[in-house]
């Protein structure tokens, strides 16, 4: 049995940014995940369910657990001294850590993805993305450090809190997954070098918004539902409503996750920095693909901290198919 800590140290030499600082940073995320796991598991017994009464910068109502997870991760990252600042879906602006001006890294995160599912005991997750800072060491970080394209990520990953708690991460040398053993208090290697299956037969999208989708996406959904033995269609529709949970299933089983732009969200709804980039990094490292329907997600230059994007990710051939439908069936302008 190999623990997450042992595995990280063992693999340090495999990637160009191998430093003890990054190892300690990942350990801080591991600690935050353990704390969140503990409190999610007693969510129905203590007063952390429901809304907080506050809204985030996007005007969305914040759940109590959103704020709890944000504070716990922020504290864990600041305490280690490797992170000079963070950006979070739950924070209006970047958070600069005072006294850590020599920290080499910045972290962007969605502390609790799918938190509205907590009240009904459905899986949720944490998403994180790590970059080397651009500004000089010894100075406070600025927004410039956070507005880097996804192809500059040093590491990324997620934690899924479900029937078991699993941490999945990449440093650019494959995707590895660790399952939490609560009796020992450690994450143990359970899936090494995870790869998408060559073909997939699941699609994940909120079909309740069908009327708002672009023509190409509507055509693709119909394609998924058609009978064709040669391509093993119709595909199976599976949608949880938590990006982490839907992506995790499709990663292991083969499939595609779709969150297109809509009439009400013409730029898409998912956040490029906190959701799309880290998941895209994982997807590509697992042999999959991630796109906004036209462009590679990791090549998009962000201009705003909370910038949104359409998002299609999963088995490479399936993402290629949806891109083709979007290209062949444009909306009437």
Swiss-Prot record:
- What GO terms are given for molecular function? fructose 1,6-bisphosphate 1-phosphatase activity; magnesium ion binding
Give the cofactor note.
Answer: Binds 2 magnesium ions per subunit.
The EC designation for this entry is 3.1.3.11
GO cellular component terms, alphabetically, are:
cytosol
GO BP term (any one): gluconeogenesis
The entry assigns this protein to a family as follows: Belongs to the FBPase class 1 family.
Q: What is this protein called?
A: Fructose-1,6-bisphosphatase class 1
């Amino acid at each position: 049995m190999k623990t997450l800590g042992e595995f990280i140290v063992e693999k340090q030499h495999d990637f160009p940014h191998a430093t003890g600082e990054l190892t300690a940073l990942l350990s801080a995320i591991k600690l935050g995940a353990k704390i969140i796991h503990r409190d999610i598991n007693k969510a129905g017994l203590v007063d952390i369910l429901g809304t907080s009464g506050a809204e985030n910068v996007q005007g969305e109502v914040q759940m109590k657990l959103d704020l709890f997870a944000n504070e716990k991760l922020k504290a864990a990252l600041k305490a280690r001294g490797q992170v000079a600042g963070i950006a979070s879906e739950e924070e209006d602006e970047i958070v600069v850590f005072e006294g850590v001006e020599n920290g080499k890294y910045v972290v962007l995160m969605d502390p609790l993805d799918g938190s509205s599912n907590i009240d009904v005991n459905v899986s949720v997750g944490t998403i994180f993305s790590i970059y080397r800072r651009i500004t000089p060491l010894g100075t406070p970080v600025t927004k410039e450090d956070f507005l880097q394209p996804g192809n500059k990520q040093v590491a990324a990953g997620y934690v899924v809190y479900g029937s078991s708690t699993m941490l999945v991460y990449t440093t650019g040398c494959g995707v590895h997954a660790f399952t939490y053993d609560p009796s020992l208090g450690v994450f143990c290697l359970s899936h090494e070098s995870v790869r998408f299956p060559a073909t997939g037969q699941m699609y994940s999208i909120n079909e309740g918004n069908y009327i708002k989708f672009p023509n190409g996406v509507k055509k693709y959904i119909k394609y998924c539902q058609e009978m064709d033995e040669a391509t093993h269609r119709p595909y199976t529709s599976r949608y949880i409503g938590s990006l982490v949970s839907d992506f995790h299933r499709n990663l292991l089983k083969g499939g595609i996750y779709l969150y297109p732009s809509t009439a009400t969200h013409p730029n898409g709804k998912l956040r490029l920095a906190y959701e799309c980039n880290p998941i895209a990094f994982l997807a590509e490292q697992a042999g999959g693909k991630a796109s906004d329907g036209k462009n590679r997600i990791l090549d998009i230059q962000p201009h705003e901290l909370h910038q949104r994007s359409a998002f299609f990710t999963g088995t490479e051939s399936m993402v290629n198919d949806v891109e083709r439908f979007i290209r062949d069936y444009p909306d009437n302008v």
